[in-house]
């Protein structure tokens, strides 16, 4: 269903309330990764340049709802935005009571989670937010899977509700990757547990041509193929499920390829010695931490021949260099592949940054949970309400 886009509206002189995802990591009050702030900049600048009175709201961390806590204040973000925009960005602590904003100016609303009722999508709170604006812009893809007052409720009651450029771009890229993909469609799903990504694996295994699994997830599939995984992280209770998923994928003409060689260690540490082994030679004392070079080469060939690639999660413990070669090889293969590629999820973005392939991945998603729920085929509440408003 279509949604209204901010780019289609005349914003001049209008009070525009934008929900961004500025939930950035902080250390001693300093921002350690500004990716989300930079991703939101084009939307904010577009509204300011159009002569709108711009108000931006976001959450930060997980404070006790309804209570101010300086550790979760957006003050560092306001300072950072001032620096990037080259003009003062005021932080408004009691913004729900209304605030004066000039045309072309930006005010940052203090952490939405300091308001009681935010997470529960409280109607009275949502109406207060809606009363602040002429146009509400949902631009926080990273929070689109949450039905909260600042992502969902406000869109119900604002005079006009639309999608910002970042959200619109995410939906377009994900649609291109999953709704009408160029084939073969290859997905990489890494991570420690099958249980947390089971619905993603089930959903993707039915639509992709090849599903490459990595990390602890791969260990469960290796165990399902009756190989010893030693002391590796895996889920014994989901071995049967992994077997069924692989069989179903193969019956549908696809596959979940398994490693032929792996890199093992005896302890989880950056000093652990990396030992290369054939998959059938893993001992009871071993822990599998990465895929081996032969497997990397095989998976890289699959990626280079793909039409579309969806990447969510590393295939090894890449934060330790000796167990990062597999993830590095796949990152470089994705970069070299002519396929349309989309990467999402925190660990994935860290791998993209570590191996310097950001410019060669077609689209980098800012969403973690929202990215996964989209992959599961779930309706995102914040998008659903925009569709509903557009059809009224």
Swiss-Prot record:
MF terms (GO), sorted A to Z: ADP binding; ATP binding; phosphoglycerate kinase activity
Domain of life (superkingdom): Bacteria
The enzyme's E.C. designation: 2.7.2.3
Residue numbers binding ATP: 197, 319, 345-348
Predominant place of localization: cytoplasm
Localisation per UniProt entry: Cytoplasm
Residues reported to bind substrate: 21-23, 36, 59-62, 113, 146
SUPFAM superfamilies recorded: Phosphoglycerate kinase
Gene Ontology BP terms: gluconeogenesis; glycolytic process
Keywords: ATP-binding, Cytoplasm, Glycolysis, Kinase, Nucleotide-binding, Transferase
Catalysis performed (reactions): (2R)-3-phosphoglycerate + ATP = (2R)-3-phospho-glyceroyl phosphate + ADP
SS bond partners: none
Gene Ontology cellular component terms for the protein in this record: cytosol
Pathway named in the protein's UniProt entry: Carbohydrate degradation; glycolysis; pyruvate from D-glyceraldehyde 3-phosphate: step 2/5
InterPro entries named in the record: Phosphoglycerate_kinase (IPR001576), Phosphoglycerate_kinase_CS (IPR015911), Phosphoglycerate_kinase_N (IPR015824), Phosphoglycerate_kinase_sf (IPR036043)
HAMAP family documented for this protein: Phosphoglyc_kinase
Subunit structure: Monomer.
Family: Belongs to the phosphoglycerate kinase family.
Protein name: Phosphoglycerate kinase
Organism: Nitrosococcus oceani (strain ATCC 19707 / BCRC 17464 / JCM 30415 / NCIMB 11848 / C-107)
Organism lineage string: Bacteria, Pseudomonadati, Pseudomonadota, Gammaproteobacteria, Chromatiales
Encoding gene, per UniProt annotation: pgk
